[in-house]
A protein has these predicted regions:
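Formylglycine-dependent sulfatase
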Residues: 1-351, 361, 370-391, 417-425
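Bilobed periplasmic-binding protein-like "clamshell/Venus-flytrap" ligand-binding domains
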Residues: 36-38, 390-407
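A contiguous binding-surface segment within folded domains or other stable secondary-structure elements
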Residues: 365
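Short, charged, surface-exposed hinge/linker loops at domain edges
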Residues: 404-419
Length: 425
């Protein structure tokens, strides 16, 4: 929403949202005359700044997205996030938000418009109603990534696994988790489909751009884990879907691209399509050339980051009681802040390198080890790869380390800033 990486302005936790003076795509669209309909959760702005980002806000209008846990705290699967089958006809906030968005389109929306739907699903706990619950044959699913050598992985993962009793979860139970996760994804497809159908029915399809993506993935059984961690970077967490439809007809319609892209690229892509002015320094790259089939490459490396400093008490997530299903991860993070320490990933098509502030680094050969099971970071034969990717990481930090506002400040009262229209070479 800004074209910034988390480190640019310190947005590295769940409790420091964008400030009113910071860039935000939704606010810029609204200022440019777009009617902005917001239906979904808020992981973006401070509450007092929310009204500046929408023209209409759809209230939640439903209960828990996941129903109630079927387990007691002492049960073996209590921390597995597996809630299972919801009652037939169960209505979630996602149903409300997408129904309202579809109705908005059928009613003849103001022009131009932007619909922003940050849905909950398929975020765990893992729960969904029929027909989605039984849609995927548990025995026909692709194999899950095996349990790795956790001594070569960040220790937060083994701490979570032990506290959540995940060693006691069977292969079939992990496959149940994955099948329900797939069902939640398919339900999300159906909910988004209602909005797309309304776009077509209202004659708006050809002149509307559509972006569908996720902010992160989940383990959902891979590596013997269930829920993401914020400073781990396996592809199941970071290689998220991105589906885009441009207005009108494009030669590349229906194509699938393996170009390396980042979520920061969303901002300049929408800004270009909407004709928004450049108001701040940002680090995304417009995807329009790739989307129009003008090029097949976009970036030669992508980055991700997460975690906190040991001494950053104000960034550590709130402690929870044992009855909270997030207790295994949050208690581990609070018991050992360095296990949740800062880390940065750089990924090319061939390699993934993770630099950790307090722990062993990671290096994976994605061509020969796509499941990221063998950490090569300390293998002397790959020292050159580590050095090359470390240099790329340093260049990235130097390039994106801060932003200077476009608007200059006066140094003395009444002193004009001047311009450079009259100058000597």
């Amino acid at each position: 929403m800004t074209g910034w990486y988390p480190h640019v302005r310190g947005h590295r936790d769940m409790h420091h949202m964008l400030s009113p003076e910071e860039a935000c795509l939704l606010k810029e669209l609204k200022d440019a005359g777009y009617f902005v309909l917001w239906g979904g959760k808020n992981d973006l702005l401070r509450v007092d700044d929310l009204p500046n980002a929408y023209s209409r806000f759809i209230e939640r209008g439903a209960g828990s997205p996941w129903g109630e846990s079927p387990w007691k705290p002492e049960d073996r699967l209590y921390y597995s996030f597996l809630y299972g089958r919801l009652p037939d006809g169960y209505r979630t906030p996602d149903d409300v938000w997408t129904d309202e968005a579809a109705g908005f389109l059928r009613g003849g929306p103001p022009q131009p418009f932007c619909i922003y739907l940050p849905l909950v699903y398929p975020h765990p706990p893992f729960a969904v109603e029929e027909p989605y619950y039984s849609m995927y044959d548990r025995d026909a699913l692709p194999p899950l990534a095996p349990t790795p050598d956790f001594s070569r992985k960040p220790r937060l993962l083994s701490m979570i696994r032990e506290r959540a009793r995940l060693e006691e979860v069977t292969e079939q139970e992990f496959r149940e988790i994955r099948a329900v996760y797939y069902g939640m994804i398919t339900k999300t497809d159906a909910n988004v489909g209602k909005v797309l159908t309304a776009l077509r029915a209202g004659g708006l399809w050809e002149k509307t751009a559509v972006f569908f993506f996720a902010d992160h993935g989940e383990y959902a059984g891979d590596y013997g884990l269930v829920e993401k961690a914020q400073n781990t970077f396996e592809d199941c967490l970071t290689n998220v879907p991105l589906v885009v439809k441009l207005p009108g007809e494009t030669p590349s319609a229906g194509a699938v691209s393996d170009a390396l892209v980042e979520l920061v690229d969303f901002y300049p892509t929408v800004a270009e399509l909407a004709g928004l002015p450049h108001t701040h320094t940002q680090f995304g790259r417009s995807l329009v050339p790739v989307l129009k089939g003008e090029t097949t490459t976009h970036r030669d490396a992508v980055f991700s980051e997460g975690g906190t400093l040991d001494e950053e008490e104000h960034t550590h997530e709130q402690r929870r009681k044992r009855k909270d299903i997030y207790w295994p991860r949050l208690s581990a993070q609070n018991l050992d802040h360095r296990a949740h320490g800062k880390a940065v990933m750089v990924r090319t098509h061939r390699w993934k390198y993770v630099r950790r502030l307090y722990e062993m680094d990671e290096l994976y050969d994605l061509e020969n080890d796509p499941q990221e099971l063998t950490n090569l970071s300390e293998d002397p034969k790959h020292a050159g790869v580590v050095a090359e990717l470390s240099a790329r990481m340093l260049d990235w930090f130097l390039t994106t380390g801060d932003v200077v506002p476009y608007e200059q400040d006066e140094r003395w009262p009444g002193e004009p800033l001047g311009d450079d229209s009259d100058y000597d070479e």
